[in-house]
Each structure stands twice: as structure tokens, then as C-alpha cells.
């Protein structure tokens, strides 16, 4: 009998640490809430119970699914989302739900903008030595990472590389990317910014 296993590696050290993780989490929450409170100064900030970064490719779909799960009839646009107000939600109610949904699933690029050089190096190492070999073992295409040493960790060349970039460019069949992401998670577990039982109550 042939058993197929995923490409899970050994537990990795935590490049962030709890204090820096909380700082990044709070910065992302503040960034997502700022445009809302600017328009609605008296708005009460909702609670965001979890924060799990997703790839840039998956982020719009993750937010859209979250919006729809709350009963909001949302649809994507070129620069975000719109909603059908026929169900009775006000614009503020929609913005509050969108805040929770978008802050719960920040994009990889957004989170990476808060990482130090050593944390970016750890993310690069995970994608280059775990994700890419896993994709190749699954029979998928994956480009070699830029080879420039530590200087690349903060460069545009590194930001432009992803082990999934060839897969996405090939316009794969429906379900292919989801299967490969489940088998070869594009982001490491240590990048999750809040685990079960961690709650953030907004007050501003």
C-alpha cells in the first residue's frame, strides 16, 4: 500500500517571539481600523479573535468568504468589495465586518512589511527549503529563489519571488492551488499572529 504524506518539516524555531508578534498584530489592527474611524469617529471597534496571514493570491477570496459567511451579500471589485444594502446593513456595519474579515486574514505582503531582516530571512528559508521542494516533489513547477545572500532579504528581487509564482501564472485548474497549498503550506506556522484563545478587544 502506498502512503502519500505531506511535506511537513520538523518544528521550526519562533523567529518572532511573543512580544514582536503582538506588536505586529496591533499594528495591523490599527492600520485596518484607521480609515474607518476617520469616517466614523464614534464607531466601536469590533473584536478580532484570530489573525492568520494568507498568501497575496488567497487574501481577496478569504475576505470575500468571510464577508459572505456573516450574511453580507458582497462581491469583488477591481479595488476591493461592494455589498448589496438590500439586506439592511448600513455602510458602517459593512465596514466593521470588513475590518474584522480583512484583519483576520492579512496578506503575506502586509505582514512581511513589518518583519525584520532576520524574520524575513527565516520566511525566505522556509519557502526556499521546505515549500519549494515540497511543490517539486508533488510534480508542480516552482522557480528557483534569487541567489544573492542576505542582501536579498530586504530587496525587491526577493519580494517578487514566490515558490507558487509559476503555478499561479499557468492558470491551473480549479482546486489545484488549494490542493498544493494544503500539501505545501506557503506560510510557516510561526507567522500566525494569534492562536486559539487569544482575543483582542478594540477600544479605539
What are these regions (language model features)?
Residues 3-6:
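C-terminal motif of bacterial Sec signal peptides marking the signal peptidase cleavage site
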Residues 8-204:
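Mitochondrial intermembrane space
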Amino acid at each position: 500500500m502506498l502512503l502519500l504524506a505531506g511535506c511537513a518539516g520538523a518544528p521550526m524555531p519562533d523567529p518572532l517571539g511573543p512580544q514582536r508578534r503582538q506588536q505586529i498584530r496591533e499594528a495591523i489592527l490599527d492600520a485596518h481600523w484607521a480609515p474607518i474611524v476617520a469616517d466614523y469617529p464614534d464607531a466601536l471597534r469590533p473584536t478580532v479573535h484570530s489573525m492568520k496571514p494568507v498568501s497575496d493570491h488567497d487574501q481577496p477570496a478569504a475576505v470575500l468568504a468571510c464577508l459572505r459567511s456573516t450574511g453580507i451579500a458582497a462581491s469583488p471589485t477591481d479595488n476591493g468589495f461592494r455589498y448589496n444594502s438590500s439586506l439592511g446593513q448600513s455602510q458602517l456595519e459593512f465596514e466593521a465586518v470588513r475590518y474584522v474579515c480583512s484583519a483576520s486574514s492579512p496578506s503575506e505582503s502586509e505582514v512581511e512589511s513589518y518583519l525584520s531582516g532576520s524574520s524575513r530571512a527565516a520566511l525566505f528559508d522556509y519557502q526556499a527549503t521546505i515549500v519549494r521542494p515540497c511543490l517539486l516533489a508533488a510534480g508542480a513547477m516552482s522557480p528557483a529563489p534569487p541567489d544573492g545572500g542576505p542582501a536579498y532579504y530586504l530587496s525587491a528581487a526577493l519580494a517578487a519571488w514566490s515558490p507558487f509564482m509559476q503555478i499561479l501564472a499557468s492558470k491551473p485548474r480549479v482546486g489545484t492551488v488549494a490542493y498544493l497549498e494544503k500539501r505545501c503550506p506557503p506560510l510557516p506556522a510561526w507567522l500566525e499572529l494569534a492562536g486559539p484563545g487569544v482575543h483582542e478587544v478594540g477600544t479605539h
